[in-house]
């Protein structure tokens, strides 16, 4: 009986091994489904300048009925396998397109990815100091903006992050609220009757009323660096070249911009400020501000802010950060992390 059982088990084992081998061979020899169409041009990550015409070429083993190109929610229909396309929106950076090829009963989709550089060379700009004012040397500045005549500043560092209303002339803090110790505060801005403040890596933002009373929180999937207001949209930087466009009502992301010059992308975008319809951004660890077209992402000017920290003495002062614009008086103020001074400046052409 024991011998018969061993024979039966051996037989079943051989069957199982053969079945696994056949299944493995079948999977290995299974032909990969081959596409009937191929996107020949443009190549992936092909580089263009805004305004360039992009040449598309499709190869197909069967006659093509039509080709539909989709970009930013708009569709364009072509009847030939080779056609030219020009982006109407004119946004810099990586642009993702969808190309659907229709051949009789068959449809196949391709996702070309191309890069647009700016079509303008940024102007070189400098600055002139118009006024030197006091600034709290313990403030690790991350955000700076005006609420009418009141200067509002958000600061960083865990356990030290706060949002404060400040007297512009004396640097006296006359109203302030602190974040919980687990949060590293970042940029801040105002939209209508609400103030928005980011945190660095906690993926959490805070909404306050005009008296700095917290009303609610919101979340976002990326790091939070700088934030400013452009009409009914919040523009948020995350330390890369990407700017996130956020609806302040429901905090949904309604778009993105990638910031490019005519030669390269601009990384480390930090504190943001809108000045007369143009976006200005500090570049982290550089003594530079870039001005940006908020609709296209292209850099319009590079402002050299070097030498500003030579105007004070401090062993603790860190990176230049913070731009505030008083729209009524057309005044621009800048400072830095742990700086003892706030400067009113004017941007001027640089030879």
PLM segments and residue spans:
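C-terminal motif of bacterial Sec signal peptides marking the signal peptidase cleavage site
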Residues: 14-16
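A short helix->beta-strand "capping" segment at the edge of beta-propeller domains
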Residues: 118-137, 168-174
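Beta-rich, blade/repeat-based domains predominating
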Residues: 137-148, 181-191, 220-231, 263-275, ...
């Amino acid at each position: 009986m024991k011998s018969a059982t061993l024979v039966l088990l051996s037989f079943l084992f051989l069957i199982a091994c053969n079945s696994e081998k056949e299944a493995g061979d079948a999977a290995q020899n299974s032909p990969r489904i081959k596409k009937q169409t191929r996107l020949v041009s443009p190549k992936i990550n092909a580089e263009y300048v805004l305004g360039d015409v992009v040449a598309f070429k499709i190869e197909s083993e069967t006659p093509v009925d039509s080709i539909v190109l989709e970009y930013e929610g708009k569709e364009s229909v072509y009847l030939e396998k080779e056609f030219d396309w020009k982006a109407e929106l004119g946004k810099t950076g990586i642009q993702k397109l969808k190309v659907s090829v229709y051949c009789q009963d068959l449809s196949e989709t391709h996702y070309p990815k191309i890069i647009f550089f700016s079509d303008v060379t940024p102007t070189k700009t400098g600055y002139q100091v118009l006024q030197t004012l006091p600034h709290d040397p313990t403030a690790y500045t991350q955000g700076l903006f005006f609420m009418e005549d009141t200067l509002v500043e958000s600061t960083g560092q865990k356990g030290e992050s706060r949002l404060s209303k400040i007297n512009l002339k004396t640097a006296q803090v006359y109203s302030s609220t602190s974040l919980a110790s687990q949060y590293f505060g970042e940029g801040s801005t105002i939209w209508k009757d609400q103030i928005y403040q980011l945190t660095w890596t906690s993926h959490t933002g805070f909404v306050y009323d005009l008296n700095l009373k917290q009303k609610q929180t919101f979340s976002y999937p990326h790091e939070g660096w700088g934030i400013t207001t452009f009409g009914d949209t919040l523009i948020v930087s995350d330390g890369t070249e990407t700017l996130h466009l956020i609806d302040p009502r429901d905090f949904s992301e309604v778009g993105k911009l990638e910031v490019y010059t005519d030669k390269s992308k601009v990384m480390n975008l930090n504190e943001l400020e809108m000045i007369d319809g143009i976006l200005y951004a500090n570049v982290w660890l550089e003594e530079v501000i870039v001005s940006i077209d908020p609709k296209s992402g292209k850099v319009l000017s590079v402002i050299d802010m070097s030498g500003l920290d030579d105007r004070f003495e401090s062993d603790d002062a860190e990176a230049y950060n913070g731009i505030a614009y008083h729209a009524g008086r057309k005044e621009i103020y800048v400072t830095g992390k742990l700086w003892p001074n706030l400067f009113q400046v004017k941007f001027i052409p640089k030879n």
